[in-house]
A protein has these predicted regions:
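Conserved Nudix-box catalytic region and its N-terminal flanking loop in Nudix hydrolases
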Residues: 3-49, 99-101, 157-166
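Helix N-cap/coil-helix junction residues
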Residues: 56-57, 124
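Short, well-ordered beta-strand micro-motif
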Residues: 7, 83-85, 109-111
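A short coil-to-beta-strand element that immediately follows conserved catalytic motifs
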Residues: 58-65
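Nudix hydrolase/Nudix homology domain
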Residues: 27, 64, 72-75, 99-174
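Active-site-adjacent beta-strand/loop module that shapes the phosphate/pyrophosphate-binding cleft
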Residues: 71-92
Length: 174
């Protein structure tokens, strides 16, 4: 499984990274995201760590925004997208991880409505970004009543773990 973060600032802009993805040979707009690869780490803490590592940001308010399957026709990957608010730059910037993919991740703040327009024009195509951007726009339209607490149970992930549809042999990070 994996987590992603839609970071929202006080001007209702979302933070998106531009990351090169070799399988499609393109740079894609993406939210900060990562695998649930530290045994025992709560999913929202993984999301907070990824926000710090990839964007150099931290947030005071966290909610579950949306859960989805990335590509259920060929993968069991379940993704939980968190909404991070009260976002500020992390003192010291990004956390250095030594991971090559995180060395140069340019990011920018995009107004929610502009991000939705980019999705609908096909200019944002990463599935996590598409789902996250549309979900945050809908959550805002619903006056944030659709948000769930950060520690909301994730039964789909439990099901996948119990049925052996999730790899549990991922090398732990130290």
């Amino acid at each position: 499984g994996a987590v992603a973060v839609i970071a929202l600032d006080d001007q209702e802009r979302v933070y998106l990274l531009r990351q090169y993805r070799h399988p499609v040979g393109m740079y894609l707009f993406e939210p900060p995201a990562g695998l649930l690869d530290i045994d025992g780490e709560p999913a929202w803490q993984t999301a907070a760590r990824e926000l710090a590592e990839e964007a150099g940001l931290e947030a005071q308010a966290w909610s579950v925004l949306v859960d989805f399957f990335n590509s259920p026709g060929g993968s069991s990957e379940a993704i939980r997208v968190y909404l991070a608010r009260d976002v500020t730059p992390r003192s010291g910037g990004r956390i250095a991880t030594g991971e090559a993919e995180e060395i140069d991740l340019p990011g920018s703040w995009v107004p929610i409505d502009d991000a939705v327009a980019l999705v609908l024009r096909g200019e944002i195509g990463n599935p996590t970004a598409v789902v996250g951007v549309l979900a945050v726009a809908e959550a805002r339209r619903m006056n944030w009543t659709t948000l769930r607490p950060v520690d909301t149970h994730w039964p789909v992930r439990d099901h996948l773990m119990e049925t052996g549809r999730v790899r549990t042999d991922v090398a732990p990070r130290h």
